[in-house]
Structures are given as C-alpha cells and as structure tokens.
Amino acid sequence: MSLLFKELDNSETVKRVARFFNKDYERLYLLAGSRLTDISSPALSQAPGHTSGNHNENALIQGITAGAMIDAVNDAISKCSYSSQVILKNLLIRKESWQDVKNQLYCEGHKLGYLRKRACLEFADAFDSAQIRHKCQPIVDLHVDKENDEGELTENKRVI
C-alpha cells in the first residue's frame, strides 16, 4: 500500500472512466461546440423579458465551462502512453470497433482488454491535474477507492 495514495478499486475506476466517455463526453462536446452559435444579440422590445436571468449569459458560461473540460480531456489524453491515446481516442471517443483498434495497435483481443483498462487508469490519473490546469469547475475525480475492512467505500478525498 502506498503512503501517499489510497488504494484504488481499479475495476470500478475503469467503469467510471468508460461511463464518463459514454455518457458525459458527447454532451460536453456538444455544449462546448455550441457556445458561440447559441449566442445572439439581445433584441429590445416593449414587452418585458423574463426575470429568470440572462439566458445568453448562462449559455456562454456553460459553453466556456464545457470547453475548458474538453480541453482538459484532450490534455489528459495527450499525457497518456501512445497505446492509451489510441484506445481513448479511437475506442472510447470515436467508438471504432475493437477489431479496428486491435489492428492499429497490432495486438490480440485479450491484450486489448488489458490495454483498455490501463488506458482508463492512466486517463483517470492525468485528468485530475488537467482539470486544475484548465481551471475546470467542479473538479471531477474519476477514481474509486477500495472498500475498507468493514466493507464501506472510503471517501474519495485527494490532495491534488
């Protein structure tokens, strides 16, 4: 056991990273890509506007935040090993087939499974510091800590 880091539940961390790419990444990408197209000049009319705040401002802030997160994802991927970069970009983001990715890496199926797990763990480690560098809020920790002796999950508090 490390003196600096809590012991990770690698399989749950891999699942969390995969879920991030399957569920969150595409939406972040769409939000980041739409940040400029959703903004329009305000139109003045005699009718009162709604009082729930400035929709254009909120859309801009959401787009900038999503853009920073996409930049952090790209930065984190660039810090990973070559095989991990190929897997993260082509298998998890572009949704290419396992066969295509195996051919790109010149490896067999069982080896690709191992490399995919390693890629997810590398990404989880690199993503923490990338979010800080890109001033993302909130910081999303993709790590899952192992259960303690009583079977409870330990809290996911890290000093970064």
Give the positions of each predicted feature.
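A short pre-motif secondary-structure segment
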Residues: I87-L88
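N-terminal interaction/assembly modules
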Residues: M1-S78, Q99-D100, F127-I160
